[in-house]
């Protein structure tokens, strides 16, 4: 069945619900005391996992649209990417405010030096910031071919973010490994999609 614009509208509504309902759950859990004895860590991990899930969902759109021959699915990619950035920002704020404290926000630079996994996290966030700021059609027209080159940096985030998660956890948990494996599979799938273009590009110089 070929998807219509109406289907895409419903998909976007579903994305909004999937991205906002967890935030509502988190707020309720905080107010009702549903978190553990270390709520700051719970909030940091929850927001980080949500950002990572949305990143993986964003990366899944292109291969899914290609293999299912549903090009309209690509219209959902920007919304997923923006929600990924939003949750990534919440993750950064939760660390800066709950872990360091507003009065010690100046220590963030020191923390980045002494904790390399934080450096990977902030690099990932900065890339997502650049992608969010240039996600409009106006930016795409203005930047031309440079727009696609910039937005290919999302694959750098797909490498750094799972490493950041794996490196940051202090207890052995399967979830960081699962997310890393999923990111690796999506990157491999993307590589297969790009390989024919790469081979064609090489032939031009023979």
From Swiss-Prot:
Please provide an example of a Pfam family that matches this protein in its UniProt record. Answer: Ferric_reduct
Q: Which cofactor does it need?
A: FMN; heme b
Return the GO cellular component terms, semicolon-separated: plasma membrane
User: This protein's superkingdom?
Assistant: Bacteria
Q: Is Transport included in the keywords of this UniProt record?
A: yes
Where is it mostly found? Answer: membrane
Q: How does it sit in the membrane?
A: Multi-pass membrane protein
List residues traversing the bilayer: 13-33, 79-99, 116-136, 147-167, 169-189
Q: How is the cofactor bound?
A: Binds 1 FMN per subunit.
Q: Which GO terms describe its molecular function?
A: electron transfer activity; FMN binding; heme binding; metal ion binding; oxidoreductase activity, acting on diphenols and related substances as donors
* Key words, A-Z: Cell inner membrane, Cell membrane, Electron transport, Flavoprotein, FMN, Heme, Iron, Membrane, Metal-binding, Transmembrane, Transmembrane helix, Transport
Its job: Part of the MsrPQ system that repairs oxidized periplasmic proteins containing methionine sulfoxide residues (Met-O), using respiratory chain electrons. Thus protects these proteins from oxidative-stress damage caused by reactive species of oxygen and chlorine generated by the host defense mechanisms. MsrPQ is essential for the maintenance of envelope integrity under bleach stress, rescuing a wide series of structurally unrelated periplasmic proteins from methionine oxidation.
Assembly with partners or alone: Heterodimer of a catalytic subunit (MsrP) and a heme-binding subunit (MsrQ).
Homology family: Belongs to the MsrQ family.
Q: What protein am I looking at?
A: Protein-methionine-sulfoxide reductase heme-binding subunit MsrQ
């Amino acid at each position: 069945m070929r998807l219509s614009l109406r289907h895409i509208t419903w998909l976007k509504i579903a994305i909004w619900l999937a991205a906002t309902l967890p935030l509502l759950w988190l707020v309720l859990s905080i107010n009702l005391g549903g978190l553990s004895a270390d709520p700051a860590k719970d909030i940091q991990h929850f927001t980080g996992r949500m950002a990572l899930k949305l990143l993986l969902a964003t990366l899944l759109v292109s291969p899914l649209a290609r293999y299912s021959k549903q090009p309209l699915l690509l219209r959902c990619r920007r919304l997923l990417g923006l929600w990924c950035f939003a949750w990534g920002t919440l993750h950064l704020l939760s660390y800066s405010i709950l872990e360091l404290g507003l009065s010690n926000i100046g220590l963030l630079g020191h923390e980045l030096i002494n904790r390399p996994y934080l450096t990977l996290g902030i690099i990932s966030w900065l890339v997502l910031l650049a992608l969010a700021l240039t996600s409009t059609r106006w930016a795409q027209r203005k930047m031309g071919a440079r727009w696609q080159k910039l937005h290919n940096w999302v694959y750098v985030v797909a490498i750094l973010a799972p490493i950041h998660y794996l490196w940051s956890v202090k207890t052995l948990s399967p979830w960081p490994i699962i997310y890393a494996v999923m990111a690796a599979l999506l990157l491999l799938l993307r590589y297969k999609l790009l390989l024919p273009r790469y081979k064609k590009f090489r032939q031009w110089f023979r």
